[in-house]
Amino acid sequence: MNDSEFHQLADTLMLKVEETLDQFDGDADIDYETNGGVMTLSFENGSKIVINRQEPMHQVWLATKGGGYHFDYQHGRWICDRSGSDFMALLAQACTEQSGEEIHFD
């Protein structure tokens, strides 16, 4: 994968996160801001989730209240380099824990 392909895939991932949050109709108030390739999700309880891209390694990183994760693009999905878990599944779990309301990223 070259840098251009990486950025296109990372942009697509972040757009999917934005679209899901924009369409979320639950009671939890989740705000997000994207600045310089870094997306920050802010929750009512003051906790945050940070998603950023690491261009030199062609990875997407996820920082949650529960820990940090690094994802590589494999077979059409972003996969955690330690656990093998899918990015969207880990993000949904973290958002659910930090917002107190079930959130799905399909």
Curated annotation (Swiss-Prot):
Protein name per its UniProtKB record: Iron-sulfur cluster assembly protein CyaY
GO cellular component, one term: cytosol
HAMAP family found in the cross-reference section: CyaY
Keyword terms of this UniProt record: Iron, Metal-binding
UniProt xrefs under NCBIfam families: FeS_CyaY (TIGR03421)
GO biological process annotation, one example: iron-sulfur cluster assembly
PROSITE patterns noted in UniProt: FRATAXIN_1 (PS01344), FRATAXIN_2 (PS50810)
Transport keyword on record: no
